Structures are given as structure tokens and as C-alpha cells.
Amino acid sequence: DGGLPNAIPRKGSVLTAMTLFWFELIREIVPNHLITADVNQYPEPLRRHAAELAGRSMLVRRTEVVPFECVVRGYLSGSGWKDYQKTGAVCGITLPPGLRESEKLPEPIFTPATKAETGHDLNVSEEEMAKAVGAELTGRLKRLSLAIYRKAADYAATRGILIADTKFEFGRAGQEIILVDEVL
């Protein structure tokens, strides 16, 4: 992810509120890492900082994070548009010719990316992800990501909002796969 300066007042509170909303909406699809966002339930050392943490933090389960961003695109924009212009494909998925920038795709597509420590993440094919983490896990994360995107996009559409694309991060807590990080 490329870092941007924070010029949005209360950005942390807004992102936390949005993530809590989406976690609730999609909880029947996949469990998540949230323990609580109520600072009164945080461990004592953290409660001393309640004023700074309230509304802008979450206490979460520790996980082993899968080292890929699970990107779902419903529209052809951003880096997907750039790839399509060059190759007619996005992350190895060939798309119909003649699509226009930001056009709705016939079906949402799963386009994973590596998690870069600095700079922008690198788009990869599903096959490249499968080589790194296994075909079974890749298939499961693809199914979960597409299901979450569809549910969120359908809900947002009822509110006049279009979700062009989004990314999800997943982790392992024991044998369980859970959704981690901020959502949508």
C-alpha cells in the first residue's frame, strides 16, 4: 500500500466504525479477528488510554496473516484498468475486448496481490498465489472474498453506493481462517 498523508479529521474513528459495520454485516460468511471495540473491556494497561483509543481502536485476536491481499474487482479501474490496457487481462484473467475504464465487469473477479512492506502491492495471478500458499487455501480465500464482496456490493447498491473493488486480508488462528484488518 502506498502511504498518504492523513488530512482527514477523525479518519481512525471513521475507518473503525466502517469496519465494525461490515464485520457485523458479513459475520455469517466468515469469522473475524474482533474481540471487542469497547475500551472498557480492554486489558488494564490499555484502559488507561481510553480517551485516545475510544472509537478508533479494536482489540483483536492474534493470527498468522496470509501474505496476500485478496482483491475483488467488480469494475475495471485502478491498477486493473492499467493491466487490462496493456494485456487485455487482469492478474492473468482474460477479459472481453473493448471494455472501458471503470466499466462493470460481467462477474466480479479475484485478483490477489502480494503484501508489500513499502510502496504498492504487486498484483499476481491466482496460480502464483496457489504456488506460495497452496491451491486449497487459495481456492477457499477466493470463495470467501467473492462472497463477501457480493454481499457488501449488494448492500451498498441499496444505498446508492458502488463498490468498484476492495481488498481483504485473512489470517489463521489455529486451524480457523478468519478475516483480519480493516474491511471495505
Identify the meaning behind each predicted range:
Residues 1-165, 171-184:
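Acidic/polar, glycine-anchored loop/turn motif associated with catalytic or activation segments
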